[in-house]
Amino acid sequence: MFTLVSCNTSKNANTNLPKDISERPADEDSQKYEQAQLDKLKASIQSEVSKEKCTAASEWTFAPMGAKACGGPQQYIAYPKKIETIILPRIEEYTQKVKAFNEKYNITSDCMMVMPPTSVKCINGKAQLITAEQ
């Protein structure tokens, strides 16, 4: 004996599917994963900048990067002006993702204000940010 089933059989096949990721609660694993993604993006930005040799400080500038939970940047990063159109959108992407991460996971920070550097100096081929205290 055989049972024939047609294509019009109405059976709900979606009952055991996992929930959409956006409906899942934030847990420790997803926070660790997102932090790892942020770390990877930050490292790729720093790697892109470090490929460039610093020979003339006038060819370099700096930008705020990241976001503290209570406001302000996490740090400043020096970059060569010649890659500004490539690097600034990536720095902004990282900063926005850090802000979203901070809000999503209720991250707290030390709220210490990171002062902007006053200039960039080339030391042994590497760009160094100079602050008022130096």
Report each predicted region and the residues it spans:
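Short, low-complexity, Pro/Ser/Thr/Gly-rich segments in the mature regions of secreted, periplasmic
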Residues: I123-Q134
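Bacterial signal peptide processing site
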Residues: N8-S10
